[in-house]
C-alpha cells in the first residue's frame, strides 16, 4: 500500500466507494498472482507516477513486489496521479534521476515502466485499434 494514498486523500475516497458498493482493491503482495486476476477484472487502475516526462506525457512507474505493473496495464481505464515534483523535461532527465538514485545506493525498482497514453496498434492496412496491449482510456491528474 502506497503511503501517498492517504497523503492525497485516496484512502478516504476508496472507503466512500466501498460504502457505495464498489469493489476496491489495494495491491497486496501477500496475494501474489491473485492481484493480477483482480487487475484483469478491474474497470479502473490507479497509480502514482514516480517520474513524469513533460515532453511526451509519459508516466514512469517503479514496479516491484509491492507495486505491480498490471495495475496500469490490465484494467480498461488507467488513471495516473502525477505529483508536480515528479515532472522532468524528457527521457534523458528521467534516466538521470534513476541513475543518481542508484549511485546514492537508494533502492530502484526491479522493473521500470514508461507509459504514454492508451495502447495503440495498427495493422498493415492502417486500421488503428486502441487498447490492444493495455487500457483503452488513460487519464492524468496532476497534484501539488
Please place each PLM-identified region on the residue numbering:
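The feature marks the mature, well-folded catalytic cores of soluble enzymes
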Residues: 1-144
Amino acid at each position: 500500500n502506497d503511503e501517498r494514498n492517504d497523503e492525497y486523500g485516496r484512502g478516504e475516497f476508496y472507503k466512500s466507494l466501498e460504502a457505495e458498493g464498489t469493489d476496491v482493491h489495494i495491491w497486496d503482495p501477500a496475494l501474489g498472482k491473485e492481484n493480477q486476476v483482480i487487475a484483469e477484472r478491474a474497470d479502473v487502475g490507479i497509480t502514482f507516477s514516480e517520474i513524469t516526462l513533460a515532453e511526451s506525457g509519459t508516466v514512469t512507474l517503479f514496479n516491484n513486489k509491492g507495486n505491480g505493473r498490471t495495475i496500469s496495464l490490465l484494467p480498461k481505464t488507467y488513471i495516473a496521479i502525477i505529483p508536480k515534483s515528479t515532472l522532468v523535461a524528457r527521457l534523458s532527465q528521467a534516466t538521470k534521476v534513476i541513475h543518481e538514485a542508484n549511485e546514492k545506493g537508494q533502492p530502484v525498482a526491479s522493473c521500470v515502466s514508461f507509459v504514454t497514453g492508451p495502447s495503440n496498434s495498427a495493422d498493415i492496412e492502417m486500421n488503428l485499434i486502441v487498447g490492444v496491449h493495455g487500457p483503452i482510456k488513460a487519464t492524468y491528474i496532476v497534484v501539488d
